[in-house]
Structures are given as C-alpha cells and as structure tokens.
From Swiss-Prot:
Primary location: nucleus
Database matches in PANTHER family: G PATCH DOMAIN CONTAINING PROTEIN, PROTEIN PXR1
A GO term for molecular function: nucleic acid binding
Name used for this protein in its record: Protein PXR1
The protein's role, per its UniProt record: Involved in rRNA-processing at A0, A1 and A2 sites and negatively regulates telomerase.
Length: 276
C-alpha cells in the first residue's frame, strides 16, 4: 500500500457537462438554424447524417506535447501504448496500424494496456498463486517429500506405549489432584460454617446475659427507690407539723400551753396547792 498523493481540490459549477447552452432553444443560433430548415437531432453539415453534437475538447493539465508520454514510454523500452495521452490518440494509433497492415498487433497492445490500467488501478488486486516448492513435491507420486529420519517400527511402538502410559499416569494424577482439591474445599466450607455458628451462639449468650444483668440492676434500683420512699413517708407522718407563721401564732401557742397544763394532773395540783 503506497503513500497517498497530494490532494487536489476540484470545484464543480452549476453546469459541469456544459450542456445548458446546447439545450437552450431560445438562443439566436438555434432559432436561425430552425428557420433555415434544421431540426433538433439532425446533422450540422451539408448531409443529414453528419455530427449531431458539438466538438468535445478534453482539459490538458500539463505542458507536454502530443504523444510525449508515448515517446517517453518507448524510450524506457516498454514499447507499448497507453491510454493516458490526449483523447483520440488510441484511435490514431489504430488507424496507423491499419494502414501499415498491423491492425491486430496494435489492437492487442492497446487492449493489454487497457486491461493493465484496470488491474493496476484503484480497484485492481494482484493474487499470488499458492503453490508448493519444487524441492518438497514429488511429481510422479504426487506427494510431499519428507526429509525426517525414518524410525524403526519397534522404536515407534515403544515410544507410543510410553506416551500412552504417560498419558494414563497424567490422567490419574489429575483426577487425584481434583479430588484432593474438592475435599479441601468442602472441609474449608464446613469449618467456616462451624465458626459462623459458634460466633452466633456466643453472641446470643452474651446478649441474654446482658439483658439479665440489666433486669437485675433495674429491680435493685426499684427496690431501693421504694424503700427510701416509705421511710420518707413515715418520717413525715411522725414529725410535728411546722408552726404556721401568722398573726395568731402567739395566741395559738398560749392556748396550747394552757390546754397542756389543764391536761396534766400534776400541774393542776400545783396550781390549786393540793398535796397528796
């Protein structure tokens, strides 16, 4: 795959095929020829079967002269023709070949050039035929030639037996290894399950113990609180009510003392001076 060439910008106009002027029937030339008897689609010469289209000129984007590319190719020793020259050059070569009596040769060369251009162009692909090397192919037997050292049948059989025994041993060891691996996995899973269960049981026991301790503490606190409340109530009931500080407190005190003296028999005897 080659490198990309330089980009060339192309700008297309509104009429890239340059057909608007020929299709326009309102032009002076078209109307003048129609008045002279000319009709659309007929020839432009004296005879009716002459050219019906205008002369088409291809754009030449280089400074090379007519046949320069062909001359360059002949100088390189190719001796062929190409279609990359100016328009009409192939037809000119065919005419010259026909005049020189080499029409078939020239036509063949031109066809080959056209085919090569198609193959080597943008969409062309070259394929390499996949064949075997001549040194490794026997044409008579039509088989590949093997250069390996030929071993005896006995050696081959011994080797085959050894390979079979090795494969059997490998299978046994592999099976044993798989079984051991499976047993280890099962033991590991059982151990994990047991550890999980033990942890859960320990946690449950701890939670139960904590709940019991909390309950005992709460009961003790309640008992202490009820005992203190009872003692306070008894103290309050046994204690005398505090004196009321009012304006009649002095009189109530005097009345109380008087009653106390009346209630006491010993005090009454002293008052009335009675001796036993």
């Amino acid at each position: 795959m080659g490198l990309a060439g330089t980009k060339i910008k192309q700008r297309f106009g509104n009429d890239p095929r340059n057909t608007n002027w020929s299709n326009d029937t309102s032009r002076f030339g078209h109307q003048y020829l129609a008045k002279m008897g000319w009709q659309q689609g007929s020839g432009l010469g004296l005879v009716s079967h002459a050219l019906t289209t205008h002369v088409k000129v291809s754009i030449k984007d280089d400074n090379l002269g007519l046949g320069a590319k062909l001359h360059k190719r002949k100088a390189n020793g190719d001796g062929g023709l190409e279609e990359e020259g100016t328009a009409g050059l192939d037809a000119f070569q065919r005419i010259l070949g026909r005049l020189n009596g080499k029409e078939n040769v020239v036509n063949k060369v031109l066809d080959n050039v056209r085919d090569d251009d198609i193959i080597n162009g943008k969409w062309g692909m070259r394929f390499v035929k996949g064949e075997t090397l001549s040194s490794t192919w026997d044409k008579e037997s039509k088989k590949l030639i093997s250069y390996k050292n030929i071993e005896d049948d006995g050696k081959k059989s011994r080797k085959r037996k050894a390979d079979e025994s090795e494969t059997k041993e490998d299978k046994k060891t592999l099976k044993k290894h798989k079984k051991e691996k499976k047993d280890k996995k099962e033991k590991k899973e059982k151990k994990k399950k047991k550890e999980k269960k033990d942890k859960k049981d320990k946690k449950d026991k701890k939670n139960k113990k904590d709940k019991k301790d909390k309950k005992d503490k709460k009961d003790k606190k309640d008992k202490i609180r009820t005992g203190s409340d009872e003692t306070l109530v008894s103290k309050e009931s046994s204690a005398t009510p505090p004196p009321i500080a009012t304006r009649l407190s002095a009189r109530s005190k005097w009345i109380k003392q008087k009653r106390a003296s009346v209630m006491d028999s010993k005090a009454l005897n002293e008052i009335f001076m009675i001796t036993n």
